[in-house]
Amino acid sequence: MSSQRRVTGLRKKLAMVLAIAFILLMWQIAAWSLPDFLMPGVPTVLARLWGDIQTPAFRVALWGSLTRLGGGYGAALLLGIGFGLIGAVLFFFREVLKSAIVILQSIPSIAWVPLFLILMGFGNLPIIVVVAIAAFFPAALSVMNATESVQQVHVSAARVMGASRWSLLRRVYLPAVMPELITGAQLAFGNAWRALISAEMLVGFGKGLGRTLSYAGETADMVGVMTNILAIAILAALIDQVILENLKHRLLRYQYV
């Protein structure tokens, strides 16, 4: 199994490298086909990115975005996992929550921004709340859907042995839903990241990668636009493929041995 795991890991890395190469190739072909002021080439943007990441302004924007992401994404995971597990032992609560999520998740995350700006004013809090809303739905749904597939024989056996609802959640449901929970966390991150960048662009307040991208667009700085898009994509890939994937393998190590 360990050799199979290594082969699978190598295939995933190769697929990622090929995907990046394909994207860069298509980008460069587009740059050759259009004037420089409309589509700068890959080398130009990479050189600009290398220069930008060494500036204090970039570090301030990066820290601002990561701070908002951490607050919103962390809150969403805690609430989503908590409510999802509660739904495992409270059937009516689960059905009400799932119905509410079906209704609310159809609303684009960016549509919440004006509401929370009016309620909370300018600052980090409305962006954090929007990020939390965007990430909450996949986190909660993944846990609730996973709890429905838990074998009832295990639940019944635990109840026969006198397990309380808390014990059921901690010793039966949580271990059983862990794989789906991690997958839900990755889906939630994608939602959170998109909501963060969109909200920062719309709010136009404070420092962040979304605000930096918006400013580049306002000043018709196409190199700056592509540089910020590239920075946003690279950072998202690093968080998802390095941090979250490694965490996934550590938490689910028993499945790979």
Give the residues covered by each predicted segment.
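Short cytoplasmic-facing helical segments at TM-TM junctions of multi-pass membrane proteins
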Residues: 142-181, 210
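Periplasmic/extracellular loop-to-transmembrane helix junction in inner-membrane transport proteins
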Residues: 3-7, 33-74
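Transmembrane alpha-helical segments of polytopic membrane transport and secretion proteins
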Residues: 1-21, 241-257
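Transmembrane alpha-helices
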Residues: 129-133, 165-198, 227, 231
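Generic hydrophobic transmembrane alpha-helix motif, especially the helices
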Residues: 102-138, 145-146
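Hydrophobic alpha-helical transmembrane segments of polytopic membrane proteins
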Residues: 209-247
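Hydrophobic alpha-helical elements at and bordering transmembrane segments
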Residues: 58-62, 66, 96-103, 143, ...
